[in-house]
Structures are given as C-alpha cells and as structure tokens.
Amino acid sequence: MKNLKSNDVLLHTLTRVVTFIILAFSVYLFFAGHNNPGGGFIGGLMTASALLLMYLGFDMRSIKKAIPFDFTKMIAFGLLIAIFTGFGGLLVGDPYLTQYFEYYQIPILGETELTTALPFDLGIYLVVIGIALTIILTIAEDDM
C-alpha cells in the first residue's frame, strides 16, 4: 500500500461516509438473509470490503491500531460458532443443523422471530471477514 499525504481531506471524509453506508447495508443484509437474499456470507463480504476501503483510504498502520483484530483468530472463532450451532438439533434427537425458530414480543420491535440460523450465519459472517481480509492484507504486506 502506498503512503498517503496527511492533507487528503476529501479522500478521508468520503472513505468514512462510504464505509458507514457499506457497514450499515452489511448489517441489513446479515439480518435480512434468513427470509430474503443476504445472510452471513454476503454480509461478511460487504463488511470485509468496508474494512478494505478503510485500509485503502488511510494508512495501514493507523487502521491496524484502531481495529486490533487478528483475522486468523476470527476465522477459527467463526468456524467454532458455525460448527457448534449444529449440535443443538442433535441434543434433542433431530439431525445436525436442524433449525428452530420462535416468535417473541419485543417491546420496541413488536413480534420478532428468533431463530437458531442466526448464530450459524454469525459464524459464517466472521469466517468470511477473516478469510477475505487475511488474503488481501497478506498480499498488500508482501508488496510493501
């Protein structure tokens, strides 16, 4: 990655705004994915692209300081969540990865569906973010 001048005000401002929009859309896709197109995979790709945009708009060192994640550990954590989510069905005699859902009344949101697919999607979300950023940042660090 190249070193940017400290007076790139337009680039930094647009990066912040566009990153916020991408992250908000990523969260929407993550939660809408149960019944509509989206879910953990595409939400993870959108989040990874937003973080990559931050790496491109600012210098890599300051972003690593602001976001101190080890993305390889994020991959492992996401895999553990996705794998262990499936064991819930086995505990009650159903097949692996059986999905359960229930509707609950939540004061502000009204009737809301809570499902066991959400933690599985969270695991996929973390795996996709971790893999995408590990690959991209490894390539970027080799070019430096």
From Swiss-Prot:
Keyword Hydrolase listed: no
One of the protein's GO biological processes: sodium ion transport
Location of the protein in the cell: Cell membrane
Annotated GO MF terms: antiporter activity
GO cellular component terms, A-Z: plasma membrane
Main location: membrane
Extent of the signal sequence: none
Family per similarity comment: Belongs to the CPA3 antiporters (TC 2.A.63) subunit B family.
Name this polypeptide is given: Na(+)/H(+) antiporter subunit B
